Each structure stands twice: as structure tokens, then as C-alpha cells.
Amino acid sequence: MKRKIIALLGILLITILSSGCVPEPKKPEGALSVVELLENPIFDTQIQVYGEVSALGELMCTCFFLRSDRENLHVWYDTMVEDNGTIRPSVSVQEINNGDWVIVLGELKSGGDHYSLNDFWVNKIEVVH
């Protein structure tokens, strides 16, 4: 009986360690968490926000969610059109995967004809190691 319990605990430990659960990395210097940004929004200004990528390739848009401190930010990497018709260049997400911790450099949008309040338009994505 004791061996079975030890074996079961060993299997459970291996499962937990290999499940892909990645602890939140230390907050990068100069970057805001999603909560910090949404509690004190800074619109149309270049800022850095960090968080975990989720829903990449799962949404009906060229966007993903960035999550930190239990809040999500809607991050757009393509199809970014200003009210005056100016099209922003797309940013590659080929090296980014769901579950990656990243820093995004870009702008929080205040809402317009082609975008919603608190959409984040990214200019650069950097994976946090």
C-alpha cells in the first residue's frame, strides 16, 4: 500500500511539473502590468506592458490576450487602422506562443472608428526569459 501511494505521488509530481505551468517571471524594469495600465490608462503614448500570451490564433482577429495580475489586455498585431485611414505595419508573432511571457511595446487606444477603448496596438514583442 505504501509503495502505491509513493508511486501515485511520484506520478502526480511529474504530471504537475510537465504540465507547462510557468510561474510569473519577475516584473521587467520599466514595464507596466495589465492591471497597472488599465487602472491608470495612458492613451496614444508608447508604453511597455508585460504579461502572458493567450488565445493567440484562437480569436477571430489578428490579436491575442495579454494577461498579468489576473487581467487581460486585447493586443492587436495587424489590421491596425487609424481614423484618418493610416494603416499601421503588422508585427510578426511567428516566434510567440500561448503561454509565453512577453513585453509588448505599443499604444493603448482610447477608441475610434476602427478600434475600441483599451485596444492595445503593438509595435514590438519581446519574449521574457
Name each region found by the language model.
Residues I16-H129:
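OB-fold and OB-like single-stranded nucleic-acid-recognition modules
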